């Protein structure tokens, strides 16, 4: 899912927090506290 892919991506970058939004079939991911 979008959230799980985003979570994995931000975890790999060692970020402490993430926000994921599924909009019109596209996954948008923002990593925070990196």
From Swiss-Prot:
Q: Which keywords fit this entry according to its UniProt record?
A: Antibiotic, Antimicrobial, Antiviral defense, Antiviral protein, Disulfide bond, Immunity, Innate immunity, Secreted
- Annotated compartments: Secreted
Top-level division of the source organism's lineage: Eukaryota
- Entry's Pfam families? Myticin-prepro
GO CC terms for this protein?
Answer: extracellular region
Q: Which InterPro entries match?
A: Myticin_preproprotein
Q: Which cysteines are joined by disulfide bonds?
A: 2-27, 6-29, 10-31, 15-34
Decide whether keyword Phosphoprotein is in the record: no
A GO biological process of this protein is:
innate immune response
Q: Does the keyword Metal-binding apply?
A: no
Q: What does this protein do?
A: Has antibacterial and antiviral activity.
Q: What's the protein here called?
A: Mytilin-B
């Amino acid at each position: 899912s979008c959230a799980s892919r985003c979570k994995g991506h931000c975890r790999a970058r060692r970020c402490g927090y993430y926000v994921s939004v599924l909009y019109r079939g596209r996954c948008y991911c923002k990593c925070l506290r990196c």
